[in-house]
């Protein structure tokens, strides 16, 4: 006799939409209020009042640092340099490979040269997380300058995280408003619950693989245009538009062809991304000192036209794309900047998964041919 349970087709959750697979104490996304908190703190408050180093500490330890910040910063600054073998590896990579391929390869190499790669105690994973956090800016800056035919600039131990990275990229520390806007972008991108790349990292961790493999998987997921690659696509679109006057017609063409408009909409937020107002203010401030009114006008016109036509609001990638462009970052480097930020959230989730692990192994509903004979 067939039971009701056996005869009912299972409910399929494409993309795991709406499925709650685990608990986390790291961040909370509330779609109804479009809010995001890190360890209980609203992200916009953290972006306004904290350094990226403080936020990294918060994500890893659960509390903002007080006296601990000095030692934390000292350890981070002491871990920034890359050795000659890493320098040689970066120099050998093809000039035409995507910068995300460079970052992915570099993280794999860090694991390959780590004699304790498979040691996964909480202390070991924290040390590896801090090392990746510290060295990724050096890797990204080295690759940016390599592609421009410029000599790498070594890290400066007397500069904070944001100042040091910008100095390694451009040979000087830019205007304070640019430094602060960049740091705010790092805070806003740092963590976002069980997004695709974070979930990829947790899946790999659930198999008891090493932290480098988990981060490499996350980088691969983030490279996709529907995830981290969107900030690059936003700026390419703005360059294609060219001027605010052309934005409505450009948008009409996109929508009539049923093409996705990058930088708008969100899988979780349906009524606006709470991170956008903070980053838009940062964009406006950078535009003032970097002669960026043209891009700000395109931003405002496209935002208004998109909302009027679809009622869809922008996500964080929309203001971040032109902000990074005005900071003089090459467009292809935008997603590696995302990696520099999200390494904090990824590794926090990796450590959380490892501390209370269960192998992630969902089911599927077969939709192919029924069983058949070879004869």
Curated annotation (Swiss-Prot):
Q: Which family does it belong to?
A: Belongs to the citrate synthase family.
- GO CC annotations, alphabetized: cytosol
* NCBIfam families the record matches: cit_synth_II (TIGR01800), PRK14033.1 (NF010636)
One Pfam match, given by its short name, reads Citrate_synt
Q: What Gene3D superfamilies does the record point to?
A: Citrate Synthase, domain 1, Cytochrome P450-Terp, domain 2
Look up the further comments and give them: Citrate synthase is found in nearly all cells capable of oxidative metabolism.
Question: Which gene is this protein's source?
Answer: gltA
Annotated catalysed reactions = oxaloacetate + acetyl-CoA + H2O = citrate + CoA + H(+)
| Name of protein | Citrate synthase
């Amino acid at each position: 006799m067939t039971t009701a349970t056996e005869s009912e087709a299972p409910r399929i959750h494409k993309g795991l939409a709406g499925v709650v697979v685990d608990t986390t104490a790291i961040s909370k996304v509330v779609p109804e209020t479009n809010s995001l908190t890190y360890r209980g703190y609203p992200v916009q408050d953290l972006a306004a009042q904290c350094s990226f180093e403080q936020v990294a500490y918060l994500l890893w330890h659960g509390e903002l640092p007080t006296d601990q910040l000095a030692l934390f910063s000292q350890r981070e600054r002491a871990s920034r340099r890359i050795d000659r073998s890493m320098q040689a590896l970066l120099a050998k990579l093809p000039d035409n490979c995507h910068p995300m391929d460079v970052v992915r390869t570099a993280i794999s190499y860090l694991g390959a040269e780590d004699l304790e790669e498979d040691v996964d105690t909480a202390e070991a994973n924290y040390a590896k997380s801090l090392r990746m956090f510290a060295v990724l800016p050096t890797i990204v800056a080295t690759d940016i300058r390599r592609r421009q035919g410029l000599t790498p600039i070594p890290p400066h131990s007397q500069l904070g995280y944001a100042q040091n990275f910008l100095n390694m990229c451009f040979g000087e520390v830019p205007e304070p408003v640019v430094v602060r806007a960049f740091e705010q972008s790092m805070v806003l991108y740092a963590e976002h619950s069980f997004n695709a790349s974070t979930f990829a990292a947790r899946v790999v961790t659930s198999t008891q693989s090493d932290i480098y493999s988990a981060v490499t998987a996350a980088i691969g997921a983030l490279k996709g245009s529907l995830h981290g690659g969107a900030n690059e696509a936003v700026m390419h679109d703005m360059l294609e538009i060219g001027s605010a006057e052309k934005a409505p017609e450009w948008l009409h063409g996109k929508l009539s062809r049923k093409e996705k408009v990058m930088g708008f909409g969100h899988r979780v937020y349906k009524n606006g991304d709470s991170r956008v107002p903070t980053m838009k203010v940062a964009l406006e401030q950078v535009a003032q000192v970097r002669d960026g009114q043209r891009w700000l006008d395109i931003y405002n016109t496209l935002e208004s036209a998109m909302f009027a036509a679809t009622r869809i609001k922008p996500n964080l990638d929309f203001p971040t794309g032109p902000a990074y462009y005005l900071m003089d970052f090459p467009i292809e480097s935008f997603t590696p900047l995302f990696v520099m930020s999200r390494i904090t959230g990824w590794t926090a989730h990796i450590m959380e998964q490892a501390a209370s692990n269960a192998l992630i192994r969902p089911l599927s509903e077969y939709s192919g041919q029924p069983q058949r004979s070879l004869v």
